[in-house]
A protein has these predicted regions:
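Short, small-residue-biased leader/transition segments that mark boundaries at the very start
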Residues: 1-9
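Short helix-loop capping/hinge motifs at secondary-structure junctions, enriched
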Residues: 12-20, 116-120
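Short loop->beta-strand "edge-of-pocket" segments that line small-molecule binding or catalytic clefts
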Residues: 22-44
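Alpha-helical segments flanking ligand/cofactor-binding loops in enzyme cores
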Residues: 23, 68-69, 123
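Short beta-strand-to-loop elements that line the ligand-binding cleft
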Residues: 32, 53-63, 101
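Ligand-binding cleft/hinge of the Venus flytrap
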Residues: 41-54
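A ligand-binding cleft/hinge motif common to bilobed small-molecule-binding domains
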Residues: 68-93
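C-terminal effector-binding regulatory domain of bacterial HTH transcription factors
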Residues: 82-91, 100-140
Length: 140
């Protein structure tokens, strides 16, 4: 399971203030990660209901790495999957904000044909992904 995380550079948060509610994002710079045609709305959950916050991104990219690097440079808040930001979070280069408002984690599935003739490459990939899933895709 993995989920979307809103995060930013700790120094950025110190300078601009840490948002305590989804609506507080309106006063922050945002970095939009996703398809270029994706909605600028960021979705959260508050008291069991979905809350949408429309952002005017400072930077739009379809690369998680670019969004993370820009956030690490102080560009603002970004939303990426937990596993994509795991290294930056672990090293303290980014910090999660609004965690209690994030949507539930998304399940990750590996789909492959059941067969005694499963290729060695597929078997190795399955073993690799399931072996690192707790570290790489762990829940908050």
């Amino acid at each position: 399971m993995t989920g979307v995380q809103t995060c930013a550079l700790p120094i950025y948060l110190k300078q601009r203030g840490e948002p305590n509610t989804p609506e507080a994002i309106a006063s922050h710079e945002t970095i939009q990660f996703g398809a270029i045609t994706a909605s600028p709305d960021w979705r959260f959950v508050e008291d069991g209901r979905e809350v949408r916050v429309t952002c005017t991104p400072r930077f739009i990219t379809n690369s998680a790495d670019a969004a993370i690097q820009y956030a690490e440079a102080g560009g603002g808040l970004t939303r990426v999957m937990f596993y994509q930001a795991a290294d930056a979070l672990r090293r303290g280069r980014l910090r999660i904000v609004l965690a209690k408002f994030e949507q539930p984690p998304l399940p990750i599935h590996l789909v492959y044909p059941t067969s005694r003739l499963l290729s060695a490459k597929v078997r190795t990939f399955i073993d690799l992904v399931t072996g690192i899933s707790e570290w790489h895709f762990g829940e908050r």
